[in-house]
Amino acid sequence: MMASNVSRDVSQDQSSVVQTCKPWYAFATVAAGRFVRFASRVTKHGGSALPGKVVEKIDPGFLTRTLGQLPLGVVLVSGTNGKTTTTRMVASMLSDLGLKVFTNPTGSNFVRGVVSALLTEVTLGGKLDADIAVLELDEAYAVHFVKQVKPRYALLLNVMRDQLDRFGEIDTTAKLLSHVAAATTGTVVLNREDPRIAALAAKAPAGTTVRYFGLADDLRRYFPSDDDMATTVSVEGVAGPFPSARTPLSPLRGQLPSEREAAAGTAELPADVTLTAVGDHKATFQM
């Protein structure tokens, strides 16, 4: 697949930032960030977030400007569980298809972590040599990320009750992810098996495509949702639009041990990437 076959438009806001940045300023930002990273490693203070924090202070437009260079934009992966594995799978598949992929390493799934990861990849002039970024973002930090960078693709996995100390009820987590869906410009890919995630289709803006991933019918009974466990369900009233139909999906059989593999295999990719190519790759991916 040739990356040139895919539209390379960049948003007006991001383009204007790239055009107005002086070369010396980009150099100063990268140099300062790398110095802080070196110093934090030598002193064993600050971790992966400190360089990103410093760069955010001295050059608030660095993230938008740098990711705005990508001809194929940003794929944002978020949800309660499975983010790291899914991000690795999508990045690996795109790389095998011939694209240069930038991705953030495990543990840096917050905005400053992405900035810190960029510092290791850009040239001193601020050039990022990549076609597309596949980024894992924590649910809470994803909200702040999309205020600076609108993803072209979003892959939203699930909301689960394993972080009650952070977010409270899972409806709060779903609300956080709704901001990601609302900011996505190209395609939002949602988990059909998670009702709260599937409902985010209503948040996608006009012109943004919505796609779903899910389990084969013979596997769905092994992964019940909270709603499936209820003995009685009643609806007393609906305040807004309510879906009247479900789009039929073609199940992927025999290769889906869990939802995250399904997500990686059905993510909406550039137009000339086929499911056949993705399916061939899944057989060789090493967990």
What is each PLM-predicted segment?
Residues 115, 120-148:
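Conserved nucleotide-sensing/catalytic segment adjacent to the nucleotide-binding pocket
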Residues 85-102:
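A conserved segment at the C-terminal end of the G1
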Residues 82:
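Conserved glycine(s) of the Walker
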Residues 99-112:
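Short beta-strand-centered segment that lines the nucleotide-binding/catalytic pocket of NTP-utilizing
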Residues 111, 141-143, 197-198:
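Short, well-ordered alpha-helical microsegments
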Residues 151-152:
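Proline-aspartate-enriched helix->loop->beta-strand connector
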Residues 2-9, 13, 17-78, 93-97, ...:
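Short, basic phosphate-binding NTP loop
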Residues 156-287:
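Acidic, Mg2+-coordinating active-site environments of NTP-dependent enzymes
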